[in-house]
Amino acid sequence: VLNYPGNPDGLTYTADELKEIARVAREYEIILLSDEIYGQLHHKGGHVSVARYYPEGTIISSGLSKWCGAGGWRLGTFTFPQSLDWLMDAMAAVASETYTSVSAPIQYAGVQAFRGSMAIERYLWNARRILSALGQRCYRILADAGVRVHAPEGAFYMFPDFSPFSRRLAEKNVLNSTMLCERLLQEKGVAMLPGRAFERPHEELTARISYINFAGNRSLAAGETIPPHQELPADFIQAHCEDTLAGIEAIVDWLEE
């Protein structure tokens, strides 16, 4: 199973990495399930499916809920190569006995989304530009404070490691990822998901941050006034994503107290 851009870390694969994965999968006849539901939110618009290099053995899973900003509208898709029709038929049989079908309103919305349009392309380009700038800003604040974290490359997640503060956190009686998230929520009002939820060791001081607590409509409208060839000005994120930045800065303040 591949998941990229990834949840919970916002990272992705390079073309060379995908080619190597494809080479190994082909050599050992491995079926790849490539979860690419965040592919449209690759921050540079450069998402490449591993199916390009291993089409005969790759199943692509995707959907509308992420790139459409429609979290409650659950319409997922699986794309199978012809060589795996037998597996597609088996999955369809199980699905028909599990949830029967997608609700009609979601199907009508899905038709419009999958048809595509220039308006959708403009929305995606604008969303990527904002998420990229905001992700880099959040990354820089945490990294400058000494938190171990990768700069996100897609989606809207980061997976920071607070172990450089383990001694200080132990003095606060914060000994695992659950305690870390509970204390930050109680004391600073910042909600994160503990690393334990992603099968990380409980004592590991990791957590997922989802940096989307901002006014999407307002930021998208403001972004559309800036020409496509220009980067967002330095004050754009501060002006339109202030709640997210306040949350990240609250984490740093809490670590330094």
Question: Which residues make up each language-model segment?
Answer:
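Active-site phosphate-binding strand-loop segment of PLP-dependent enzymes
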Residues: 1-44
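Helix C-cap/helix->beta junction micro-motif
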Residues: 27-28, 145, 188
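Conserved core segment of the aminotransferase class I/II
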Residues: 56-132, 136-142, 228, 234, ...
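Short, solvent-exposed loop/turn elements at beta->coil junctions and helix N-caps
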Residues: 64-65, 146-147, 195-199
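Conserved glycine-rich beta-strand-loop-beta hairpin in the small C-terminal domain of fold type I
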Residues: 128-139, 149-168
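PLP-dependent enzyme catalytic core of the Aspartate aminotransferase-like
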Residues: 169-174, 183-192, 198-257
